[in-house]
Structures are given as structure tokens and as C-alpha cells.
């Protein structure tokens, strides 16, 4: 029987659930969960999506993601494929890790968004020691939402969801905590089912179109790095690695290009090298302050 095509609306918010195969825990230790969070950060940068919330349990993960013009299937493939490669190498295993495709539903109104966010953050109450204090669970974004913990990986964009609980952040956090403690898991399960749904829900979000020109990206990076744009097509020059890496990240993020497309544009480069440059570029954006808003700067200049 053919699989049902997944709805991939670029302007949608998705509640995503990833589950491991029956006999294997998705996360065996804290290091595994930290690795998954680092991959969320990486692919958030590459695809310019917004992650509204997450909760990583031992055998499954819940994510709340605004696609912002990206193809959600590509986003999740990047995250889960990279994690499966890491997991299989670490534990010297072969074969699939995830159970089928990820499950997803489209969040089609503000009330439903509130409910889904609360449902995700309520998951740790299934663990005995966190039954009455889910905010203490380190691998849920709840602690970040209510100001109890800093976002160590810089993953979560909680402002939009919190605005649905009030304009004053302090009061919104109090309201959020009250909702978490006052609602039963059974009630949420009645409202949340993983089915693809059509929607025209847009709220006040602006979608990022992925139709920027590669020539503009090359010119922008060349100007920012103080080099000739011709040099960005040169393969063997270690001094240009940072520049080429940033070009690759921006093309992946803003042009909806595949690795093969970027290979053709830069010339004389393999897909494996393109992937490596992308990783280098993401690391630069995360680790060096002067590059942390480089994607935003480009969008501001060329929109």
C-alpha cells in the first residue's frame, strides 16, 4: 500500500514526533540527547526554521517547528539522518534507528498551538522524579520557557508561543506554569492526534521565501570578507575556507539548493566537501560573534 504524501506547507507550524524502533532506545544517555540538540541547532541555522519547543524522552522526541518557508521533510531528514549516523557509529550497530518516517501534524490555530506546546512540555511527568516538577527535566524546553534555565544550545524561539499567554512575560510564564500543572495528560491526548491536516492558518508570521540569488550571496560574502568574489571559486586555498563555508550555508539556507547545485555553482568541488564546508560554516555562525547574524544581515540587504 502506497504511503500517504506528507503535507509540507512552508508557512505551517508542525508538531513532530520521532520514535525509535521498538527494541532500541533513541537516546541511551545524556550525551545522546545533547548531540540531538546540537543537530537541532545546526539544521535550524541551515534551513532558517524556528523551533518553538522540544522534549527529548528516552525512546522518542517531540518538536514544535515553524517551517518559515523550508521543506519540513528536508529539515527532519537532515536532523535524523545525522543523528542515526552518530548513534550507529557510537554503539557499533547497523540498520535503521527511527520507526518509519517522523509523524507530524499541522498546528492550525492559536488555541491548538497553546495546547500542543503544553502537551509537549508535560511529557516529563511520565518520569517518576519529574511527575510534579516537569520544569526540572533538562531535555525539555519548559525550563527555558519559564526562565528557570538558559538555552545552552540557542535552539528555542519561545517568544511567539509565550505571547499567546499574555503580553507581560512574567505573568505569561506564571500562566504557562498554571496550565501545565492544571491540565491532565488525558485531556490533551483527546485533542492531539497525528494526522496530516490542511490549513490556511498564518497568524502574524512572515514566511521567508527561498528564492535568493547565488550571485548575490557570493557578492555579499566576498564584500564582507574583503576578497574578490572570483576567489570563492578556487578550490585549494585554506585562507578561503571560512568564506566558502559561509557561502555554502547561505545557499543551503536561502536558495533551496541541493548539494549538487552548490557544487555546480562553486565548481570543481565534491558533494562530500560541500557537506563539510556547510558544517564548518554552521560552526562559525555558532562560535564567532561576528558571524552569528550573517544570514539575517544578508536577508536585510537583499530582500
Regions found by a protein language model. Give the residues of each.
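Short Pro-Cys-Gly-centered "Cys-loop" motif that presents a nucleophilic cysteine in a tight turn
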Residues: 1-53, 57-58, 66-303
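Conserved G/P- and acidic residue-centered "switch" motifs that form tight phosphate/ATP-binding loops
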Residues: 62
